[in-house]
């Protein structure tokens, strides 16, 4: 292998956690000088202990707090299309075991061996989020690997991920192959969802909530459900497919609600499905004053605490959401609360939610806790890859 740059740990920084499996190296862990700062972002670099013992091969970016991402423990590895194909094959084998239909998260970043890379599959369409500099640089190789394995009709580079700005990357979405102006149909939990992969939120659909949708659907059988912060109707359409008598979706985005309506129509649920456009807190307050109550109330907001500085404000928002949602639950009904905030762990999120429920004068029992779907594996040394929390409560 040709000579590659070398990076070493600082004398006062232990490499132990990296040697035991932690996949990131921070800027204050290593010696950064004029030489290393000239290395282009996304370059593959050999990482060593301070006494020159090889650790592995990393993707280097001096412009990011995450200076290094472990690519391979073999310092002589060649990171190319074939290397990426092997990672995709391993990830695909797991998804084929889990799902009958080709709609899922194919690559979940470090947990699937492709640091900083998200790939969602919508049948013959693939949405790639290269959220690390190396992946952005190697999009041609990632594209080639997808072509070899899947021969897809559509490959979209989605550059909307917040992490890209932390890597010094742009936010330009590009169709690398094919195009799609119309929403794509996704069959999931016996319902049909509409995914706008080019103009919708994130990659177009939240596969991470699939199992939580299914569990909630059981609770709604024979009753009513309101899906607050609904996006394209994830919880509500699944509930209708499982026997809910009515479902209401609440969101501030009319395009998202339009997709939810199209999904309800395609699923045959149009007569039992309704929507409210507006601020979720205002809509919940209005519905409470109007005397509306539901067998199941779901509150699945965007990240109220996306970072540590936003944590306290975010927890207050989760408390408020739980308080208002609790008031809409019928006696003996169910409350489903979700958080996708990295900064708020389950303990903090649960505490804020229970305080809110208590302030609403409601009591109950936790019957289940959920996380991201099984196509979102968790890196065993990276708590950040486990971000989604869900609490299911039965209220008195």
Place the predicted regions along the sequence by residue.
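Mobile active-site "lid"/loop adjacent to the S-adenosyl-L-methionine
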Residues: 294-324
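S-adenosyl-L-methionine
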Residues: 255-296
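Conserved SAM-binding motif I beta-strand of class I
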Residues: 246-251
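Non-catalytic substrate-recognition/targeting regions of SAM-dependent transferases
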Residues: 107-120, 136-205, 214
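Conserved class I S-adenosyl-L-methionine
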Residues: 222-231
